[in-house]
Amino acid sequence: DQAREQDWELLKFPMHDGFHHYIKKLNKLYCTIPAFYKAELDKDSFKWLEINASEKLVYMFERRVEQESIVAAFNFSDHYYMDVSFAYFEPVKLIELINSDYEIYGGCTAVRPVEIYSEWNQEAHIVKMDLPPFTGRLFKMERV
């Protein structure tokens, strides 16, 4: 009902408060990082990184605008996956921007700075990460 005020009293419950802070942070990222909103209809600004793990319900993609790249990784299942990976054509570093499994959002992962470096395996640069159940992680990707 748009005629009445939001149910702000729900924020006294940890799960609601966590979700409120998660959406607030996500909106801030969206408004301040052009790779989230520029060229959204340009097919060259989007690249699937992992779609072959659909039986696991794991998906990863890159959004690139000019020299800026964001990597999104999602686990839509109730399983914890360790060392989920994707191959990249050059060495990169991922800097975590947000993780829906952070404790402050109601999850189980402690908030700490996370940087993931790709590893060369004689064929490609491999990026590995853990994906807890029902989790989305967003990273800024830098070339190294």
Region roles according to the model:
Residues 1-144:
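Carbohydrate-interacting/catalytic domains
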